[in-house]
Amino acid sequence: IKGGMGARPNKDGINAVAAGISNTMNTPIEILELSFPVRIDYYEITPDSGGRGRYRGGCGSRRAWTIVDHNARAAVCLERTKSPPFGVCGGEAGARASIALKLADGSIRPLLTKGGFNAPAGSQILLEVPGAGGYGDASERDSQACARDLQDGYVSAEPD
């Protein structure tokens, strides 16, 4: 599952991209579901996760797994959960990472961002990886770029 790449002085950041040094891989959903008793409920770009700016920071992604038919033990190591990915030259910060466990009764329990946890059968793991910071003042963003962001689902509303 991938996070956003920061905006550059002349271009938006890249959405949901692998960082070469992050020791992560983007295992296809079909392989995960064939290899483990889990169901991937969604895997998508997280709207509004890229920092606003003249150039928008790349959006992060989010994924939900349902533990199908047994209790499971999982481990996580997330960064950017307390301090968001910063923007530069007046750009706004991207969204922070988070992880939570939705239990069968519908209650949601935030999880520690480093370490192991138990996930009972029928529970759902909710993971959001961070977006990235924007570059430059958001009031200088091209109006056509704002409209494309809305159309593409990278933002949920046009800026004020």
Language-model features: where?
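Glycine/proline-enriched, intrinsically flexible loops and inter-domain linkers
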Residues: I1-P159
